Regions:
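Flexible, active-site-adjacent loop/turn segments at secondary-structure boundaries
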Residues: 15, 19, 37, 85, ...
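Structured, hydrophobic secondary-structure cores that serve as assembly/anchoring elements
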Residues: 61-91, 95
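Sequence/fold signature of self-assembling virion shell proteins
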Residues: 42-56, 88-201
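Generic secondary-structure signature for well-ordered alpha-helical cores
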Residues: 6-14, 70, 172, 184, ...
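Alpha-helical scaffold segments that mediate packing/assembly in large oligomeric complexes
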Residues: 1-67, 199-200
Length: 201
């Protein structure tokens, strides 16, 4: 009974981080120095649905992060399902990525490596959203709470790399055992200069 409970709790954690990532502002398509806008804004930098401007959008993101003195290593491009589809339709890009990789991309469920970014799909992100970031742009904290002294049984369980609390006790009101899995978790933008977003036209 613990495994499905732990899976259910762990599945909520990426959604929280996805909500935080979706707040990152996009560069304006015509002027990278202008104030950022929401990725849904008509002025926002966007991938074309036919994929014809993939490299241009990635180059713009690099320009913005480079201008903010963001390190070149540990750069990731996390994309929603709609943007992921655009990348997957670009056979030339995928062929280059896979031929240079010896199979690691497939093992890691990575879409491609392009312009210094590792491209990954994140279902918790909005479909038409992409966020370019360096690993220190965001923080995710997950903590298993202490087991209360009154619990009949309590322990930590691991699920998808997260530590969760499992407690059991008896509920006399309903004459049944209770099993609860929970954790404290939160996400935040640590440094907005280390991330920029784009939408999908």
């Amino acid at each position: 009974v613990v495994k499905p409970q732990a899976e259910a709790v762990a599945s909520l954690i990426p959604s929280k981080l996805g909500e935080v990532m979706a707040t990152v502002q996009a560069s304006q398509a015509t002027d990278p120095r202008a104030a950022g806008v929401a990725y849904t804004d008509a002025k926002a930098l966007k991938f074309k649905a036919d994929g014809s401007n993939l490299l241009e959008v990635v180059a713009r993101a690099n320009r913005i992060l480079n201008g903010n003195k963001v390190p070149f290593i540990n750069r990731t491009l996390a994309v929603g399902s709609g943007v992921a589809e655009v990348f997957r339709k670009n056979k030339d890009l995928l062929n280059v990525s896979f031929s240079a990789d010896n199979g690691g991309l497939l093992r890691d469920a990575t879409i491609a490596k392009v312009g210094g970014f590792t491209v990954v799909e994140e279902p918790a992100l909005p479909d038409a959203f992409a966020v370019f970031y360096e690993k220190n742009a965001f923080a995710l904290a997950v903590r298993a709470a202490d087991v209360p002294a009154g619990a009949t049984f309590g322990d930590s369980v691991a699920q998808d790399g997260f530590a969760l609390r499992h407690i059991c006790d008896y509920d006399p009101t309903y004459a049944e055992d209770r099993s609860v899995v929970d954790a404290y978790f939160g996400a935040a933008v640590l440094d907005a200069r280390r991330a920029t977003a784009a939408g999908l036209a």
